[in-house]
UniProtKB/Swiss-Prot annotation:
This is V-type ATP synthase alpha chain. PANTHER family: H(+)-TRANSPORTING TWO-SECTOR ATPASE, V-TYPE PROTON ATPASE CATALYTIC SUBUNIT A. Signal peptide: none annotated. Keywords: ATP synthesis, ATP-binding, Hydrogen ion transport, Ion transport, Nucleotide-binding, Translocase, Transport. One of its GO terms (cellular component) is proton-transporting ATP synthase complex. It comes from the Bacteria.
């Protein structure tokens, strides 16, 4: 018999309930009000009273309303059909909700995440008599561009034997495809889909590896200077309007991964709508089909209830872990984790907990760490390797990187891509600061060469600050040349034109080739009669390199420009 309760207090989206029976932490419940069932989750248990955060607007909830507990944690449904979908934080398919409710979402309407009527062409890879454990493959269906493996549900803890498995054919997600038997002789029916709690990491693998293989983003400044590894973590903090969302969209389009999951948690509705409109029209460079075929979007805009923001982050990472179990490489982009932290701050305040810095809860760091730690590269039971790479954008107020959310994130991520107002105002894209950013991972360029080039940026910035005080006349010709070289590196290599078909995505081969050209210019000693001649010469080199960036790799125009560049360099080189 299900546990019942009644509402005894309402404070915003925090509801206090008097319980008649046993309940557990994070259990899902439904509040019956005005003919609707509103979904909520227990976040604190005290004696015979519990506090629950409601995933909907709480208008109309009154003292005495009946509450029914489900005895289940907040779960997601995992199975074929997740890709191409747009979900809210509770995994309701938004296009289906729009058909049922119109464009304005109604409270208390929850739909099944996966299409139960669609038939999937199942091809078996296991046979009767095979011994299996949780996470082992029974067969696969083709979903978009990936082989979607049908697995033994992750909650099955024993060893089983397959006693029945269907022949190849078309089946829906609810049809039985196999029967397995445990050691005690009890039989279990297996379908293509199952549920898994979002706050419990999926750990059905042999071992975790240290992330080492670079995840190519085809953005030069990231791959060369601040690389991200497959199974690694990175964050993109920056002030409003610095280009975080655009950088994430470019990364999702060009990254060397099988599946992209976008968690738009608390981002402005306009930006989410832009993503939803653009992605179906974008062409995946790897397959030539729509980018949505390998994408799943979880969106909770800033206008939706705050409690669902937290759910959207966990829903996204759980779906990512599910696809990792198939031996695929996943990229999860959370935009923005600051809004999620603000939702936590709101709930913490309502629970009257002792606040930490800037009123964020004292446990902010551990919650953020537990989310990023679910990323990783793993060896599966069958020897395949899968990875989940997590990138979270952070929106610190005023671009202040010292605030708690940024600092808590910096402690757990492996790469930091800090965007600055100064660079974005100067129309430099990506606006990643080459002076403040860092990475612990190995990139596509030799680290010693990259460090040498970066030293020019540091020196160039110091000389630039000096020139602002004393002018060009107050510095030596040698220092002025270092400054010009740093400007050349910045404009020709660090910046990219994401609207140009060639320059938007740069392969690792081309990055190595172009970096060597720039590196040789940095190492070359030049001789000039005065500073004006030096500036004119470096501007000519810069224009030549920019034209090369917009030319197809090693075609006639590219080779001609490279030859002209080489002649220019030899003209002023000190032998």
């Amino acid at each position: 018999m299900k546990t019942k309760g009644k509402v005894v207090g309402v404070n915003g989206n925090l509801v206090t309930i008097e319980v008649e029976g046993s309940v557990s932490m994070n259990e899902v419940l439904f509040i019956k009000t005005a003919g609707r069932n509103l979904k909520a989750e227990i976040i604190r248990v005290r004696g015979n009273e519990v506090d629950a955060q409601v995933f909907e607007l709480t208008k109309g909830i009154s003292v005495g309303d009946v509450v029914e507990f489900t005895d289940k944690l907040l779960t997601v449904e995992l199975g074929p059909g997740l890709l191409t979908q747009v979900y809210d934080g509770l995994q309701n398919p938004l296009p289906e909700l729009a058909i049922q409710c119109g464009f304005f979402l109604e409270r208390g309407v929850y739909l099944r995440p996966l299409n139960k009527d669609k038939k999937w062409n199942f091809k078996k890879t296991a046979k009767v008599g095979d011994s299996v454990i949780a996470g082992d493959f029974l067969g696969f269906v083709i979903e978009g561009t990936v082989h979607h493996q049908i697995m033994i549900p992750f909650y099955k803890r024993d060893s089983y034997k397959i006693v029945e498995i269907v022949n190849d054919g078309n089946y829906s997600i609810d049809e039985q495809i196999a029967v397995i038997e445990d050691d005690s002789g009890m039989k279990h029916s297996i379908t293509m889909s199952f549920h898994w709690p979002v706050k419990i990491p999926i750990t059905n693998y042999k071992e975790r590896l240290i992330p080492s293989e670079p995840m190519l983003t085809q953005t030069r400044i990231i791959d060369t200077f601040f690389p991200v590894a497959k199974g690694g973590t990175f964050c993109i903090p920056g002030p409003f309007g610095a280009g975080k969302t655009v950088l994430q969209q470019v990364t999702s389009r060009n990254a060397d991964v099988d599946i992209v999951i976008i968690a738009a948690c608390g981002e402005r509705a306009g930006e989410v709508v832009e993503t939803l409109k653009e992605f179906p029209e974008l062409i995946d460079p790897k397959t030539g089909k729509s980018l949505m075929d390998r994408t799943c979007i979880i969106c909770n805009t800033s206008s939706m209830p705050v409690a669902a923001r937290e759910a959207s982050v966990y829903t996204a990472i759980t779906i990512g872990e599910y696809y990792r179990q198939m031996g695929l490489d996943i990229l999860l982009l959370a935009d923005s984790t600051s809004r999620w932290a603000q939702a936590m701050r709101e709930m913490s305040g309502r629970l009257e907990e002792i606040p930490g810095e800037e009123a964020f809860p004292a446990y902010l760091e551990s919650v953020i760490a537990s989310f990023y730690e679910r990323a990783g590269i793993v060896v599966l039971n069958n020897g395949d390797i899968g990875s989940v790479t997590v990138g979270g954008s952070v929106s610190p107020a005023g671009g202040n990187f010292e605030e708690p959310v940024t600092q808590a994130t910096l402690k757990v991520v492996g790469a930091f891509h800090g965007l600055t107002r100064e660079r974005s105002d100067a129309r430099k894209f990506p606006a990643i600061s080459p002076l403040e950013s860092w990475s612990k991972y190995k990139g596509v360029i030799d680290s010693k060469k990259a460090e040498y080039a970066r030293s020019f940026l540091v020196k160039g910035n110091e000389i630039n600050q000096m020139m602002k005080v004393v002018g060009e006349e107050g510095i030596s010709s040698e220092d002025f040349l270092i400054y010009l070289k740093s400007e050349l590196l910045d404009s020709c290599y660090l910046q990219q034109n994401s609207f140009d078909s060639v320059d938007a995505a740069v392969s690792s081969e081309r990055q190595n080739y172009m970096f060597d050209i720039v590196y040789n210019i940095l190492k070359t000693n030049f001789e000039f009669s005065d500073k004006l001649q030096a500036r004119d010469f470096m501007n000519e080199l810069r224009q030549n390199l920019l034209d090369m960036n917009l030319s197809s790799f090693k075609d006639y125009k590219f080779n001609k420009l490279e030859q002209a560049l080489s002649e220019l360099v030899n003209l002023k080189k000190v032998i």
